[in-house]
């Protein structure tokens, strides 16, 4: 799906349009690359150069975008990387490399960013760094398509789509997911930990009001309630 949306592969049939751009049209490929950025699972398959300046400026030059230095500076700020502290890229951890690939996408400043299982290859510290970047991007108005098999990560989303055999079979708003856990069970998907904890607390007559709370807010509320229970 990620490769089709970004124009790297053609659909088996029909067509995919991104803001009226046909993703299969080779003549529109550069326009599509400016509009849709993509971050893959393995950053080592996405990084071409061993120098951070060369890596981040490569796509900008190919797409004939101006203000290269400013774009790179702003992109690195968003992923919290100081380029002066970065040596050769092949010496970085996978988590750091993934932050570099995200910066490369952000430098182009696309309308949409596709994250295709971006935390699969990285450790827990790297995962948390990527999650924070995504949350900040959402807060700053970026439109993100996040593809994952890890149901813990669906809590990052505002709207959740479940695909089965390449077809969209369910669409759920995140705030509705708490009351629609059976949908996940129907497709043999793991229940996110935060929802499992809420269900266990409810069985112990501890009911947490989750109305108007984000998932992060619910997590904080669970911690608060559990701390209060310990004190009592």
Annotated model-derived regions:
Residues 6:
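Helix-to-loop junction immediately C-terminal to a conserved catalytic motif
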Residues 14-24, 32:
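Conserved ABC transporter NBD signature motif
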Residues 88-92, 96:
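Conserved ABC ATPase signature
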Residues 183-232:
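ABC ATPase nucleotide-binding domains
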């Amino acid at each position: 799906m990620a490769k089709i949306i970004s124009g790297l592969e053609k659909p088996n049939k029909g067509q995919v349009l991104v803001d009226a751009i046909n993703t299969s049209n080779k003549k529109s490929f550069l326009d599509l690359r400016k509009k849709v950025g993509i971050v893959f699972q393995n950053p080592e398959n996405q990084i071409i150069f061993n120098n951070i300046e060369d890596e981040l400026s490569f796509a900008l030059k190919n797409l004939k975008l101006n203000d290269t230095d400013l774009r790179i500076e702003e992109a690195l700020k968003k992923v919290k990387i100081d380029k002066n502290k970065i040596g050769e890229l092949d010496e970085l951890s996978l988590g750091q490399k993934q932050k570099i690939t995200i910066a490369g996408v952000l430098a182009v400043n696309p309308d949409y960013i596709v994250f295709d299982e971006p935390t699969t290859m990285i450790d827990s510290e790297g995962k948390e760094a990527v999650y924070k970047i995504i949350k900040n991007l959402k807060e700053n108005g970026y439109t993100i398509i996040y593809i994952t098999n890890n149901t813990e990560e669906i809590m990052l989303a505002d709207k959740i789509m479940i695909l089965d055999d390449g077809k969209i079979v369910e669409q759920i708003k995140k705030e509705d997911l708490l009351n629609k856990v059976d949908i996940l069970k129907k497709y043999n998907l793991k229940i996110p930990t935060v929802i499992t904890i809420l269900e266990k607390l409810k069985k112990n007559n501890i009911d947490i009001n989750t109305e108007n709370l984000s998932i992060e807010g619910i997590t904080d509320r669970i911690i608060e309630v559990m701390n209060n229970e310990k004190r009592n």
